[in-house]
Structures are given as structure tokens and as C-alpha cells.
Amino acid sequence: MVSFTSLLAGVAAISGVLAAPAAEVESVAVEKRQTIQPGTGYNNGYFYSYWNDGHGGVTYTNGPGGQFSVNWSNSGNFVGGKGWQPGTKNKVINFSGSYNPNGNSYLSVYGWSRNPLIEYYIVENFGTYNPSTGATKLGEVTSDGSVYDIYRTQRVNQPSIIGTATFYQYWSVRRNHRSSGSVNTANHFNAWAQQGLTLGTMDYQIVAVEGYFSSGSASITVS
């Protein structure tokens, strides 16, 4: 699967009224969990990004703290998740939850850099399609309890954080799939650099669920 390039989500505001305690609790619960339209923004202290290609069939919801959920059925191409803006080159990212794809989907640490423009993935889990299919393996790195295979692919005249562009994608694909754990990003970025895959100035960095004409559900918390 060539990557489904992504980004973007929106924020909703909720006004409160003086009411009985039960009503106040309900208001807080609604405020903490928001089903949103495609866009980018901040929610409960975390940056979020949600994008889809307009096919529908996807419900992305921001929850409390670093939690988000996605439910999709007969969807097109989408990606959504929570993290940081900007990201860093040495962050240890924790994630936990459930990930239940049926078809073509990824769960990954996902982000971009500028100058050079790079889209990158540290793939922790995936559905029926291995994203390394058809790509040339450049190396491998052992980190966080598994070997990851390293690849580089290119996208030509595709959507990006600066509009339509041609850019490289860097990949680390975990051999032992998981839906919870910690990712030491520096281990991957250093291993990529040893293969000549350099990153520029960091843009956003999130834990993302991505899908491509598939179905499934996920509920992930990042920190």
C-alpha cells in the first residue's frame, strides 16, 4: 500500500450552564469526548490530526487526555491520531489500547519533517497488507523488543503538509506486531541516518491509525 498521506481535524467548543450536579458531570463528559470532522488542532493537551479522502464511513473521536478512537466501515483512505506539534527526534512514545483492523490498515508512530520534506512511519501493527511489500529493504534495527525492517519509498505529486509534492517516505516495520508499548524514536531515526535517510526540521508527530478501503475499530491512548 503506498501510504495514505494524511492530516487534519477540528475542535468543538461546549458551553456550560449552572445546573444540578448530574448535568455538570454530563457536560464535562461530552466536552472530553468529541467526534470531529477532518482537520488538525489541540484536544486535552495533545495535538491531533484527522484526514480522510471524502469517501466517508469513518468516525474519529477525541477522548480525554491522549485518548482517541476510530471506527470505520467500507471506508476510503483515512488517517487520524494524537501526539505533538512539533515532534522531536528523541521522544519515547507510550501507547496502549485496542486495534482491530479488517483489511488494509496501519497502527504507527507517524509524522513529517521539513527541509527535506519527509513522511515517516514506525509501524507497530498492520492488517492484511504489509507496507513493505514491493519495497527494497535497506537495513534493520532492534528496538523495544523486536526487529524492525527499514525501507524507503517515494511519492510523486501526492498530498503533503505543504500541498501536492514529491517526497520520500521512511519506514521501520515491526516484525512482532503489538497494540501497546513504548517506541524509542531516536533508535529508529539514528538507524535511518546510518542508511542515509536524514530528517529535517520536525513537524507533527502522532500515534496514528490509518486505513485504506477497509473496516475496523481502534481505541488508543498516547503519552
Swiss-Prot record:
Pathway: Glycan degradation; xylan degradation. Induction: Induced by D-xylose, dependent on the cellulase and xylanase regulator xyr1. Repressed by glucose through negative regulation by the crabon catabolite repressor cre1. One of its GO terms (molecular function) is endo-1,4-beta-xylanase activity. It is found in: Secreted. Glycoside hydrolase involved in the hydrolysis of xylan, a major plant cell wall hemicellulose made up of 1,4-beta-linked D-xylopyranose residues. Catalyzes the endohydrolysis of the main-chain 1,4-beta-glycosidic bonds connecting the xylose subunits yielding various xylooligosaccharides and xylose. The catalysis proceeds by a double-displacement reaction mechanism with a putative covalent glycosyl-enzyme intermediate, with retention of the anomeric configuration. Produces xylobiose and xylose as the main degradation products. Belongs to the glycosyl hydrolase 11 (cellulase G) family. This is Endo-1,4-beta-xylanase 2. It comes from Hypocrea jecorina (strain ATCC 56765 / BCRC 32924 / NRRL 11460 / Rut C-30).
